[in-house]
From Swiss-Prot:
It is an enzyme of class 7 (translocase). Binds a dinuclear copper A center per subunit. Its cofactor is Cu cation. Cu cation A2 binds at C196, E198, C200, H204. Pfam families: COX2, COX2_TM. Component of the cytochrome c oxidase (complex IV, CIV), a multisubunit enzyme composed of 14 subunits. The complex is composed of a catalytic core of 3 subunits MT-CO1, MT-CO2 and MT-CO3, encoded in the mitochondrial DNA, and 11 supernumerary subunits COX4I, COX5A, COX5B, COX6A, COX6B, COX6C, COX7A, COX7B, COX7C, COX8 and NDUFA4, which are encoded in the nuclear genome. Its main location: mitochondrion. This is Cytochrome c oxidase subunit 2. Component of the cytochrome c oxidase, the last enzyme in the mitochondrial electron transport chain which drives oxidative phosphorylation. The respiratory chain contains 3 multisubunit complexes succinate dehydrogenase (complex II, CII), ubiquinol-cytochrome c oxidoreductase (cytochrome b-c1 complex, complex III, CIII) and cytochrome c oxidase (complex IV, CIV), that cooperate to transfer electrons derived from NADH and succinate to molecular oxygen, creating an electrochemical gradient over the inner membrane that drives transmembrane transport and the ATP synthase. It is a multi-pass membrane protein. Cu cation A1 binds at H161, C196, C200, M207. Residues 1-14, 88-230 are mitochondrial intermembrane. It is found in: Mitochondrion inner membrane.
Length: 230
């Protein structure tokens, strides 16, 4: 969960998000080293009065500033490609959920069950219970079992939306007429908040996402209760 004056990412709640945090630190260190080197060169050039008017070209320097950036790009690309493959890998999901974006709410359908589907609207500020988060709470949460592979299919009914939960490292575009998919594993129980991350109209800021991860037996009890109420 984000908090005021937060400078870093939210706490990771999935293996993919943990990998993304490590990759961020890896890339940030490379950027820091490059920035330090460039700053040192600029200061050295400005602070000295010595100049060399006779070096018009240097084969060695040209080799260095061609090979070195290539090596740096490879060091960034390899871990990035690894994470991309991890995000695309879907092996035997325990639960498949279809999320459809509407103006301006989300609807969820648990495709492994015959009639388990519901709409999820933002709770208005005046209806919040003590401890609720303004503009983030919903009347129905997307409940998933923890430590289980979850496949989510994302689409939209009207305009472009985007289903995003930062703690899980997920951001998937919801496109009308197109079905995108991704997978995730929630590594610990908890409630994780997200929002539509694609400007989709006047009430774009008022279609939050709430994912609640619970133990498997709690999920089975919840799904049974939802089916009885359907």
């Amino acid at each position: 969960m984000a908090h005021p004056a937060q400078l870093g990412f939210q706490d990771a709640a999935s293996p993919v998000m943990e990998e993304l945090l490590c990759f961020h630190d890896h890339a940030l260190m490379i950027v820091f080293l490059i920035s330090t080197l460039v700053l040192y060169i600029i200061i050295a050039m400005v602070s000295t009065k010595l100049t060399n008017k006779f070096i018009l070209d240097s084969q060695e320097i040209e080799i260095v500033w061609t090979v070195l950036p290539a090596i740096i790009l490879i060091l960034i690309a390899l871990p990035s490609l690894r994470i991309l493959y991890l995000m695309d890998e879907i092996n035997d999901p325990h639960v498949t959920i279809k999320a459809v974006g509407h103006q301006w709410y989300w609807s969820y359908e648990y495709t492994d069950y015959e009639n388990l589907e519901f709409d999820s609207y933002m709770v208005p500020t005046q209806d919040l219970t003590p401890g609720g988060f303004r503009l983030l709470e919903t009347d129905h949460r997307m409940v998933v079992p923890k430590e289980s592979p979850i496949r989510i299919l994302v689409s939209a009914e009207d305009v472009l939306h985007s289903w995003a939960v930062p703690s899980l490292g997920i951001k998937m575009d919801a496109v009308p007429g197109r079905l995108n998919q991704t997978a995730f594993i929630v590594s610990r129980p908890g409630v994780f908040y997200g929002q539509c991350s694609e400007i989709c109209g006047a009430n774009h800021s008022f279609m939050p996402i709430v994912v609640e991860a619970v133990p498997l037996e709690f999920f089975e009890n919840w799904s049974s209760a939802m089916l009885e109420d359907a």
